[in-house]
From Swiss-Prot:
Organism, scientific name: Pseudomonas entomophila (strain L48)
Residue ranges of the region described as LID: 122-159
Protein name, per record: Adenylate kinase
Gene: adk
One matching Pfam family: ADK_lid
Disulfide bonds, paired cysteine numbers: none
Length: 216
């Protein structure tokens, strides 16, 4: 089963991806990991990619699709895979269709922007240990201090409200149109890929149950 997870940053895709890969015994593949692996392995495609990256240029969708086709032909993808952060744009999605990369299921995890801002902007981290807190959902015993060491907690730059809102605006302009693209593709293609819209609010367990039900 080949699965694409859609959803804004902070919607909980990473958490659900873990459950999907474990349940179906499929790898999670990201373009970043694929790029690094191909360059490291020195494959013909990897050497071509290295040239582009060394020149400080953006890797074309065409090269990315070649990379995807090479990756999904590997033995660990025999039962399928979960695409992580790909496709990000309509041209990439169209290129996958044109290249004959079939997708079985597309799951959209939908969460309101304000909910996401609240989730992410409320995170606090103890840098030395990696322990994470949330000022509303999982507050430390003493405000701004790590429970174990009493050291200061920080807010990562990625979690600052203005950063989160910028990432959400990029998502809405570039990636959200994929929702419409895959809904139309599914409707025009007798339900392949199977498209599922899931509300990403509630307990992790309840969302996981809905995601797995959509894929079964």
């Amino acid at each position: 089963m080949r699965v694409i997870l859609l959803g804004a940053p902070g919607a909980g895709k990473g958490t659900q991806a873990k459950f999907i890969t474990e349940k179906f015994g499929i790898p999670q593949i990201s373009t970043g990991d694929m790029l690094r692996a191909a360059v490291k392995a020195g494959t013909p495609l990897g050497l071509e990619l290295k040239k582009v990256m060394d020149a400080g240029q953006l890797v074309s969708d065409e090269l990315i699709i070649s990379l995807v086709k090479e990756r999904i032909a590997q033995p660990d993808c025999a039962k399928g895979c979960l695409f992580d952060g790909f496709p990000r744009t309509i041209p990439q999605a169209e290129a996958m269709v044109a290249a004959g990369v079939d997708i079985d299921a597309v799951v959209e995890i939908a969460v309101d922007d304000e909910e996401i801002v609240g989730r992410m902007a409320g995170r606090r981290v103890h840098l030395a240990s990696g322990r994470t807190y949330h000022i509303v959902y999982n507050p430390p015993k003493v405000e701004g201090k790590d429970d174990v060491t009493g050291e200061d907690l920080i807010q990562r730059d990625d979690d600052r409200e203005e950063t989160v809102r910028h990432r959400l605006s990029v998502y809405h302009s570039q990636t959200k149109p994929l929702v419409d693209f895959y809904q139309k593709l599914s409707a025009a293609n007798a339900g392949k890929p199977k498209y599922s819209h899931i509300e990403g609010v509630g307990s992790v367990e309840s969302i996981t149950a809905k995601v797995l039900a959509a894929l079964s």
